[in-house]
From Swiss-Prot:
<dbReference type="GO" id="GO:0003746">
    <property type="term" value="F:translation elongation factor activity"/>
</dbReference>
<keyword id="KW-0648">Protein biosynthesis</keyword>
<dbReference type="InterPro" id="IPR005517">
    <property type="entry name" value="Transl_elong_EFG/EF2_IV"/>
</dbReference>
<dbReference type="InterPro" id="IPR035647">
    <property type="entry name" value="EFG_III/V"/>
</dbReference>
<dbReference type="GO" id="GO:0003924">
    <property type="term" value="F:GTPase activity"/>
</dbReference>
<dbReference type="InterPro" id="IPR041095">
    <property type="entry name" value="EFG_II"/>
</dbReference>
<protein>
    <recommendedName>
        <fullName>Elongation factor 2</fullName>
    </recommendedName>
</protein>
<dbReference type="Pfam" id="PF00009">
    <property type="entry name" value="GTP_EFTU"/>
</dbReference>
<keyword id="KW-0963">Cytoplasm</keyword>
<dbReference type="GO" id="GO:0005525">
    <property type="term" value="F:GTP binding"/>
</dbReference>
<dbReference type="GO" id="GO:1990904">
    <property type="term" value="C:ribonucleoprotein complex"/>
</dbReference>
<keyword id="KW-0251">Elongation factor</keyword>
<dbReference type="InterPro" id="IPR000795">
    <property type="entry name" value="T_Tr_GTP-bd_dom"/>
</dbReference>
<dbReference type="InterPro" id="IPR009000">
    <property type="entry name" value="Transl_B-barrel_sf"/>
</dbReference>
<feature type="modified residue" description="Diphthamide">
    <location>
        <position position="602"/>
    </location>
</feature>
<dbReference type="Pfam" id="PF00679">
    <property type="entry name" value="EFG_C"/>
</dbReference>
<dbReference type="InterPro" id="IPR004161">
    <property type="entry name" value="EFTu-like_2"/>
</dbReference>
Length: 736
């Protein structure tokens, strides 16, 4: 068993930061990420060579093996020797499918380099671009692997010259993205130069790979590779020996991806926005193993035997069992019970793991992904790492119940665990019907969650057909309305206004947040979104669906005592709007004045909540309310002759073509369609292009539903929720 020998060697190298690399593999779905990971794992001796490529060692969930796609981001530590020196490479495999983006984005936070895998036939696709963009925003340095060269030879029958032209084009496309999205100081430095060995090409399935320096060193020509495939299997096996894939890739990683200390010097200012003069900064910038512990959790797993396993990167200090640590976001102390490193799907115990490494900890039961863990000494002064920007939203929902009603408690527990592991799976209980609602990024996301319920927890469930999650908003400003509490002793005077596009952008990109410095926030809103100085200073709350509550009152007695209750009332009103009980988005709620009863017994939540809600809803219904629907962006590649057919499918689906680009042999269509029209789009595109189209999709934006469909849609949503079809009128919320 190589593995045991390896664990001891791996632990030895962990203490030497120059010999560590933290990398991820990102790509569009099906471009060959997991096959590449397997080859790397087999070379590092974690699974036998015979089954690498078929083993899909990192795809260790049954679901992943069956569907041939990665659902979770898995970790493994690899061992590689370069120029006689041993290196430890922490590898994170990430899903390529758009429905699992949140996992990929969380993985990008803890790595310093990304191997971008591109299929030589399909070229750069939507998810390639999207993940590369996020990687560059996180200051993760890319290198490139152009995969499936065998397809260029066997399927497209390209000549050696044409193969080279295709590779040059892909490198050019990736470099264009780097020049577009990288921070200014890295735009030139990070451009990929094949001559320096920053681009590898090969076949992950056939397990061979080369870089230009290796080609020159081994004296291999493109015509030799074409020749190998004409000679058959034995020649391919020979090529595996002459040009093993792991050698090309891992050499490229060691040479061109920075070690954790080098990377943290330029990544910390980007991902951690604490006080630059805080003494902890010097430890973070140097990844100092003797400094205080600072760890960022990027992944939570529920192990049936061990309980909650929190995996993350140690940015400073050393993680040891028995130590008490502080969770900055959860604001609780926890004791680390066990520390381990990953080897494929297995955790190997360690006495300690030092800065720069990826580690797994048991005992941090209250940790969630995105949590910052710090030594107790800094519990009051540590700023958490920046929140991760998620590109997608969970917009598809199913109602779910166990086939066997006695398993309800088991279902609640299982759903809670699934949400822990994947925070973009959202679980809610419908108070009216008692149903459990599960929301995900797309239908596939939900299907996989249901399969996991069955496979991991033995739960058979019944689900409703998928429904789309909408948002409610307004298009005009309302006048001020009075909301009275049921006992008539408290009154709130409130108006509502739509937030402008610039404010929504600042909120959705996480530039403006509820818990940031109020002066800095006011300055950004004034300068970038044209806010009035007074309003910008007086923000009381910002909720998760991008609504803002502002306090413009002066001298109202007892307001401070009920401030938290008012904020709760605002949040509740925004959670379910008046039109169809869907979440509200993009509304500024202004409190102008209030009358509050002096006796606390008469101003509890049961009085304040309805008063605040009624004033907001009355204003909302007079301000040209509407429903927003989620829109998908499609990126379709297809032979030129099918463009007409594709265009008519898009139009039929209430979509619109944004651009059509002609490429060498194919056309690229960028289009948008509503999520509600997308459930059968895959079959339709296949039918009209004789199966020759390939496409990717991502969440694009929220857009108002066409006016001629609005009332009908509101009635449908309300009926589905067991409400009467007509929405309420403003008068329904105004007390006489």
């Amino acid at each position: 068993m190589v593995k045991f020998k390896q664990t001891s060697e791996v632990l030895k190298i962990m203490g030497n930061i120059e010999q560590i690399r933290n990398i991820g593999i990102t790509a569009h779905v099906d471009h060959g990420k997991t096959t590449l990971s397997d080859t790397l794992l087999s070379a590092a001796g974690l699974i036998s060579e015979k089954i690498a490529g078929q083993a899909l060692a990192l795809d260790y969930l049954d679901v992943e093996q069956k569907r041939q796609m990665t659902v979770k981001a898995a970790n493994a530590s690899l061992y590689h020797e370069y120029k006689g020196k041993p290196y430890l490479i922490n590898l994170i495999d990430t899903p390529g499918h758009v429905d699992f983006q949140s996992k990929t984005i969380r993985a990008l936070r803890v790595i310093d380099g990304a191997i971008v895998v591109v299929d030589a036939v399909e070229g750069v696709m939507t998810q390639t671009e999207m993940y590369l963009r996020v990687a560059l925003e996180e200051r993760v340095r890319p290198v490139l692997f152009i995969n499936k060269i065998d397809r260029l030879i066997k399927e497209l029958r390209l000549s050696p010259t044409e193969i080279q032209q295709r590779l040059v084009q892909i490198v050019r496309d990736v470099n264009t993205l780097i020049a577009t999205y990288a921070d200014k100081e890295f735009q030139k430095a990070w451009l990929l130069d094949p001559m320096k060995g920053q681009v590898a090409f090969g076949s992950a399935r056939d397990r061979w790979g080369l870089t230009i320096p290796l080609v020159q060193q081994k004296g291999i020509k493109f015509s030799d590779i074409v020749d190998v495939y004409t000679r058959g299997k034995e020649a391919v096996a020979e090529l595996q020996k002459t040009a093993p894939l792991h050698e090309a890739i891992l050499d490229m990683v060691v040479k061109h991806i920075p070690n954790p200390r080098e990377a943290q010097r330029y990544r910390i200012p980007k991902i951690w926005h604490g006080d630059p003069n805080h003494e902890i900064v010097k430890y973070l910038m140097e990844a100092d193993p003797n400094g205080p512990l600072v760890m960022l959790i990027n992944d939570i797993r529920v192990d049936p035997h061990a309980g909650l396993v929190a995996t993350g990167r140690i940015y400073s200090g050393t993680l040891r069992p028995g130590e008490e640590v502080w969770l900055v976001n959860a604001r609780v102390p926890q004791r680390v019970l066990q520390v381990s490193l990953y080897m494929g799907p297995y955790r190997e115990l360690a006495d300690e793991i030092t800065a720069g490494n990826i580690a797994a900890a048991l005992g941090l039961e209250k940790a969630r992904s995105g949590e910052t863990v710090v030594s107790m000494k800094y519990k009051d002064t540590m700023t958490p790492f920046e929140k991760l920007k998620m590109i997608t939203e969970s917009v598809v929902t199913v109602a779910i119940e166990p086939k066997n009603p006695q398993q309800t408690t088991k279902l609640i527990d299982a759903l809670y665990k699934l949400h822990l592991e994947d925070p973009s799976l959202i679980v809610k209980i419908n108070e009216e019907t008692g149903e459990y609602l599960l929301s995900g990024v797309g239908t596939l996301h939900i299907e996989i969650a249901l399969t996991l319920l069955k496979d991991l927890y033995g739960l058979e469930v019944v689900t409703s057909p998928p429904v789309i999650v909408y948002r409610e908003t307004i298009r005009d400003r309302s006048q001020v309305f009075e909301g009275k509490s049921p006992n008539k002793h408290n009154k709130f005077y409130i108006s509502v206004t739509p937030l402008n596009e610039e404010t929504l952008r600042l909120l959705s990109e996480g530039i403006i947040m509820e818990d940031m410095d109020a002066r800095e926030r006011a300055k950004i809103l004034r300068e970038q979104a044209g806010w009035d100085a007074d309003e910008a200073r007086r923000i009381m709350a910002i909720d998760e669906n991008l609504n803002i509550l502002i306090d413009m009152t002066t001298g109202v007695q007892y307001l401070r005592e009920v401030k938290d209750t008012i904020i709760q009332g605002f949040r509740l009103a925004m959670r379910e709007g008046p039109l169809a009980m869907e979440p509200v988005r993009g509304v500024k709620v202004v409190l102008h004045d209030a009358v509050i009863h002096e006796d606390p017994a008469h101003r509890g939540p049961a009085q304040i909540f309805p008063a605040v809600r009624n004033a907001i809803f009355a204003g909302f219904l007079t301000a040209r309310p509407t429903i927003l629907e989620p829109i998908l962006k499609l990126d379709i590649r297809s032979p030129m002759e099918y463009i007409g057919n594709i265009s008519s499918v898009i139009t039929k689906k209430r979509g619109k073509l944004i651009e059509v680009q002609q490429m060498e042999t194919t056309a690229r269509v960028i289009a948008e369609i509503p999520v509600s029209e997308s459930f059968d789009i895959a079959d339709m595109l296949r039918n009209v292009t004789a199966g020759k189209a390939i496409w990717g999709q991502e969440f694009s934006r929220w857009a108002p539903v066409p006016e001629n469909m609005l009332m009908d849609l509101i009635a449908k949503i309300r009926t589905r929720k067991g409400l009467k079809p007509e929405p309420p009128k403003p008068e329904d919320f105004l007390s006489p």
